[in-house]
């Protein structure tokens, strides 16, 4: 990913914006609801401060989690959040590189992270996620996607209370339909957008 994520200032600004995302909790709740009641291992890609993985593990008390991130400020936040949790393993990894060998998982989740990698890498990553999922596993990606038009994007910025000058320079937004098509082509089943608010969408696929 881009070097912005090495900056504590950039990471702090991102987390502050993320905390103010309208309806974010609705998307997170829908994501957690799509995870089977019994899961043993959950992989969180681009974990940030660990908010999503924390929600998942609270809802699925028998699960253990692996949190992947490469930003030093985010890794620091992860270590603070999960300092006393034996259920979480933290791994330093850049999503622009192939996933490390971490075994297989019953669920792979991500929240506002994959849109920071180039489009070609997005598809490669989706293929790698398919490979590490157990049969019956689910991939849930709460993601920032491209708007259908410049006008829709402007309205999204307005709803967020920001201007074009405030946009994250590391964003590499891709439309939702392309990503759903990729998931289907890779072999995921029941692929759909399970929740959406403007440019924020929950993309879900299952491995049968």
Model region roles, listed by residue range:
Residues 1-37, 51-52:
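Conserved class I S-adenosyl-L-methionine
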Residues 43, 49-97:
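Class I SAM-dependent methyltransferase SAM/SAH-binding core
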Residues 100-108:
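A short acidic, Gly/Pro-enriched loop at the edge of an enzyme's catalytic core
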Residues 110-114, 142:
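Residues lining the SAM
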Residues 123-135:
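A short glycine-rich, Lys/Arg-flanked "PGG" loop and its adjoining helix->strand segment in the class I
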Residues 142-186, 191-193:
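C-terminal alpha-helical "lid/dimerization" subdomain adjacent to the S-adenosyl-L-methionine
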Residues 189-208:
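Core SAM-dependent methyltransferase catalytic element
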